[in-house]
Design a protein with these regions (language model features):
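Amphipathic alpha-helical polymerization modules
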Residues: 1-126
Length: 126
């Protein structure tokens, strides 16, 4: 019963989904960085609507059934370069740093939840 309640809690489910999304975003940002000098390359990222849609699902309590987002071409990104590549190294590095920080925070939350479960099962704190 305790185990079921932990893994079915809204916060835990949301954290898992956000970890998956952060992993996917990291892959996209890494791809952007790898293609910073590729002529014609267009940056990819999670859809701009992802955060709002995720928040709406949280409020509605339907986060467990949310589909995993897909990386999409960032149509809002403009190119200042003649070769058509719209990746800006500074912006990508900032986005990557922010994404890593968010991932670390989520990992700490999930890890803390699992530590509480282990403590409840074993009765020990270590």
């Amino acid at each position: 019963m305790i185990i079921e309640s932990l893994f079915s809690s809204k916060n835990y489910q949301a954290s898992k989904k956000l970890l998956d999304a952060a992993t996917l975003r990291h892959e996209g940002l890494a791809t952007n960085l790898a293609n910073v000098e590729t002529p014609g390359y267009k940056r990819v990222d999670l859809p701009k609507t992802f955060a709002a849609e995720f928040a709406a699902r949280m409020r509605a309590g339907t986060i467990a059934t949310a589909a995993m987002p897909k990386l999409t071409e960032d149509l809002a990104a403009t190119s200042q370069r003649k070769d058509g590549n719209n990746v800006e190294l500074d912006k990508e590095l900032l986005a990557l740093g922010k994404n890593v920080s968010e991932y670390d925070t989520l990992t700490e939350f999930v890890s803390g939840s699992l530590k509480q479960l282990r403590m409840a099962i074993t009765g020990r704190t270590t």
